[in-house]
């Protein structure tokens, strides 16, 4: 695990975008694993701006998103398909037919999980997976207690996760209770993982992540066992991580 420190959210976003752009330029048909949420907005904004200014092409890129709420149609304003179209896909030259997100409106969500897992394998696996980290350490929607060997599956969302996402919905009760998520095993097959963290709200879980104890109680801790993980975090998110730890991981 390598740590890249950023002064603030804007710098974190730029550094993340630079890594994604480099990946796409090196391998134009890359498979990118993408994430949603407020942490990613700055990165996607930078990718759109770079595409506009420099013409970086995504014509041959394939994307697979981490997760999707169950019960929301793709055109629902709070679906992750809608988020991705609004913030990235509609502003770059990627064909929508090459962008894949679990179908949360499927009549058979268990079959959809199996289909999605097979889809990722058929694409040759994920070259670069973008991740955020939840306040409870979740990655994707893999909540504490999730098996590290889990493939794509249906998950019951923890109350804390639903509360964190309630600001996007009319009320807490409107937040879906279930989602389809790539499993931890699915994520860990990615060739390179890029985890982003910003803000003081993430400081406690980042301190726990850098304690190095690998446990299902902190799903993100499994990343310590992956050979190629880059963490980009701003000073607020790192405020509880001791300087000596930062130095070790910055090398």
Curated annotation (Swiss-Prot):
InterPro entries hit by this protein: Glc/Gal-6P_isomerase (IPR006148), Glucosamine6P_isomerase (IPR004547), Glucosamine6P_isomerase_CS (IPR018321), NagB/RpiA_transferase-like (IPR037171)
Pathway: Amino-sugar metabolism; N-acetylneuraminate degradation; D-fructose 6-phosphate from N-acetylneuraminate: step 5/5
Reaction(s) this enzyme catalyzes, per UniProt: alpha-D-glucosamine 6-phosphate + H2O = beta-D-fructose 6-phosphate + NH4(+)
EC number: 3.5.99.6
Keywords (A to Z) from UniProt: Carbohydrate metabolism, Hydrolase
Principal EC category: hydrolase
Gene Ontology biological-process entries: carbohydrate metabolic process; glucosamine catabolic process; N-acetylglucosamine catabolic process; N-acetylneuraminate catabolic process
Domain of life of the native organism: Bacteria
CDD domains for the chain: GlcN6P_deaminase
Annotated catalytic residues: 67 (proton acceptor), 136 (for ring-opening step), 138 (proton acceptor), 143 (for ring-opening step)
Gene Ontology molecular-function annotations: glucosamine-6-phosphate deaminase activity; identical protein binding
HAMAP family: GlcN6P_deamin
Function: Catalyzes the reversible isomerization-deamination of glucosamine 6-phosphate (GlcN6P) to form fructose 6-phosphate (Fru6P) and ammonium ion.
Protein name, UniProt field: Glucosamine-6-phosphate deaminase
Record gene name: nagB
